[in-house]
Amino acid sequence: MKKFLSILIVMLVTGLAVFANDQQEALNFFNSYVSAANSYSPTVATMYSPNAKIIRQVVKPDGTLVNVNTDTATYVKQMRLGQAGAKMRGYKNHYTNVTVTPMGNGAYKISSLRQPSGENYKLKTYMVVKKVNGSWKITEEMMQTKVQTFLRYAK
């Protein structure tokens, strides 16, 4: 019985260490995403799963929220178009209150508050990341925005 309990405890501790490692890896992936995005690196596009769920939650002037969903290919195309102007303006996002929550199945939800350059407000954001074929990918992303032009893509 002692041997069984010892083996069980070792397995539990090992499992927790692997879990903590993956959670830290997910956070490291998020930090590398922020760094790549703020330096306008083309690698940002490769950080998304080809079928990621992309949500832009538009905060209307009256405070109501409208979700605008898009596919990964369209989002990456829009992102590449916007990068040149953002780079010229020195636009960057600053993230605070970053938390990593396990969702099961190897997926982690990384939630944070995003403060755009030159603004004094913070907006909610989250991404769900998962290891796919050995590398971390964004499988879902929700980012609040006050940019009203996204509303024309709402369905």
Set out the residue ranges of the language-model regions.
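Positively charged n-region of N-terminal signal peptides that target proteins for export
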Residues: 1-4
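A short gly/proline-enriched turn/hairpin at secondary-structure junctions
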Residues: 53-69
